[in-house]
């Protein structure tokens, strides 16, 4: 970037802040703010109003504000209305760390919440509830397009990394993650916050891109930069479909990606000198070193991420065909079909109690990991991802397995909450995210209403979704500012108003 361009970016950032009338030094740290009750409180649970002051919000959207008012007017339950009012705008209110609204090259940095870095997966999911509004809200569309283009820049540089620092042109300082990771390919810590290779991160970029294009039909998404990011993703699929051993010599192959961290936690690093445990040839699946929880995979053919990639490669084929990029479109479809074949052959397995189910992880040798984790993509989320229908027989069996402590070691039960957790936090904590996904993938009215009741109480009176909560006490929780979970809750309410309005609407028959 030339000196004069840097000056323009700097001045634009100041202008953007001034346009929002943000007195930056006067705004409280939302990590602290979200952990305290603010008034007015409303509803039977007296849930507080947790949005920051208007002048402290990081982005304003008239269409989002109107949606909040429209939904509040429709909802019978005052507690759900307050939760939606807090959760729906949380990403816009608190996590738009930087936005350059250049009509030719918009850029947007979306942090996770209390961690001041952008995760590709989290940021994509944080923006999803706003996409249906983008066509009629030009500033919102520009914000989302900017997020897509910023993600593209990140992935072009370091496609194996999951979390990123503010872009150089934002003039924002980065943060040290406190680790001394040894990773190949090497990365630049000025650009990358963490470099865990997670297949679902790549799928999340494709999902955000497709969903934006689906709602807006905006052809400006197809930039040289965006197409280069897609080609980098295809390159990673090629590299990570390779087995651990050379099929001719039988010797171990040099892995493209390795990760080692000095840690006491087995879920934070990879075995065998950072390569992870062996994968067999001819599995037609893609390796993932880490899960969406940022925990290491045990068996690196991680089925939920492969399923998500099938869906998003099919979507990619659709949008590329429509935009005249037939060659890349065909490549995407070939990969989608190949991975689907691998899931059919290796991902559907026989469980001694639950019958034919989807495995969580496999290695192509016959090893199977039966479990599920709260983070999306998960086995529970397969219908939400668009991979199967809710009544798919294998999914129905899988759902019974993973919503049972007999079939899923991370299905946790306690005095106040039962649901799926995971190794990331430990064996006492359920993630509200898993209850939201359970409701999104359910057709049972009683089950959905029961889940909503638990979700209302899970906030410990703070009116926001938390990362995880102790099974015995809602007052013990992690991460009061976890924007992805707030966006997912908003998605659930919007979904139920459309799919099952009789459960939520006033005077519904």
Curated annotation (Swiss-Prot):
GO molecular function: alpha-mannosidase activity
Chain ranges passing through the membrane: 4-24, 140-160, 296-316, 368-388, 417-437
SUPFAM superfamilies listed in its UniProt record: Six-hairpin glycosidases
Domain of life (superkingdom): Eukaryota
Record keywords, A-Z: Endoplasmic reticulum, Meiosis, Membrane, Transmembrane, Transmembrane helix
Pfam families, alphabetized: Glyco_hydro_125
A single cellular component GO annotation: endoplasmic reticulum
Any one Gene Ontology BP term: carbohydrate metabolic process
Biological function: Has a role in meiosis.
Protein name: Meiotically up-regulated gene 157 protein
Gene this chain is encoded by: mug157
């Amino acid at each position: 970037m030339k000196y004069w361009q840097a000056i323009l970016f700097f001045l634009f950032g100041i202008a953007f802040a001034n346009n929002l009338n943000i007195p930056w030094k006067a705004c409280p740290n939302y990590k602290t703010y979200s952990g305290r009750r603010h008034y007015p409180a409303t509803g039977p649970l007296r849930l507080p109003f947790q949005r920051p002051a208007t002048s402290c919000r990081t982005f304003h959207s008239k269409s989002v504000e109107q949606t909040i008012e429209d939904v509040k007017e429709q909802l019978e339950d005052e507690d759900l209305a307050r939760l939606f009012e807090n959760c729906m705008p949380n990403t816009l209110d608190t996590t738009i760390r930087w936005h350059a609204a250049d009509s030719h090259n918009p850029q947007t940095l979306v942090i996770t919440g209390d961690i001041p870095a952008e995760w590709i997966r989290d940021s994509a999911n944080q923006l999803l509830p706003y996409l249906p509004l983008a066509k009629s809200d030009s500033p919102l569309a520009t914000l989302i397009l900017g997020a897509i283009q910023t993600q593209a820049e990140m992935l072009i540089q370091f496609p194996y990394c999951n979390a990123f620092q503010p872009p150089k042109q934002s003039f924002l300082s980065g943060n040290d993650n406190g680790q001394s990771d040894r990773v190949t390919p090497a990365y630049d810590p000025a650009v990358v916050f963490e470099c865990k290779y997670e297949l679902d991160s790549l799928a999340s970029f494709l999902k955000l891109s497709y969903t934006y294009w689906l709602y807006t039909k905006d052809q400006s998404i197809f930039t040289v930069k965006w197409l280069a990011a897609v080609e980098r993703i295809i390159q990673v699929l090629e590299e990570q479909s390779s087995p651990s051993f050379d099929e001719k010599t039988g010797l171990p192959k040099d892995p493209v990606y390795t990760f080692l961290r000095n840690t006491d936690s087995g879920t934070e690093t990879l075995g065998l000198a950072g390569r992870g445990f062996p994968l067999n040839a001819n599995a037609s699946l893609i390796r993932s070193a880490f899960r969406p929880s940022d925990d290491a995979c045990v068996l690196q053919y991680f089925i939920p991420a492969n399923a998500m990639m099938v869906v998003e490669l099919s979507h990619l084929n659709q949008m590329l065909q429509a935009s005249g990029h037939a060659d890349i479109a065909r490549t995407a479809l070939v990969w989608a079909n190949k991975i689907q074949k691998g899931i059919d052959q290796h991902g559907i397995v026989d469980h001694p109690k639950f019958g034919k189910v989807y495995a969580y992880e496999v290695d192509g040798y016959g090893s199977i990991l039966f479990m599920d984790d709260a983070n999306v993509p998960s086995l529970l989320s397969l219908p939400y991802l668009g991979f199967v229908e809710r009544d798919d027989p294998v999914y129905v069996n899988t759902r019974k397995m993973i919503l049972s402590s007999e079939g899923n070691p991370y299905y946790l039960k306690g005095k106040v909450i039962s649901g799926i957790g995971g190794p990331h936090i430990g064996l006492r904590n359920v993630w509200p995210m898993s209850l939201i996904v359970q409701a999104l993938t359910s057709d049972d009215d009683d089950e959905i209403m029961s889940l909503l009741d638990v979700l209302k109480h899970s906030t410990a009176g703070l009116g926001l979704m938390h990362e995880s909560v102790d099974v015995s006490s809602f007052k013990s929780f992690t991460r009061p500012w976890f924007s992805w979970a707030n966006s997912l809750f908003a998605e659930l309410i919007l979904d139920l108003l459309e799919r099952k309005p009789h459960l939520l609407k006033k005077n519904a028959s």
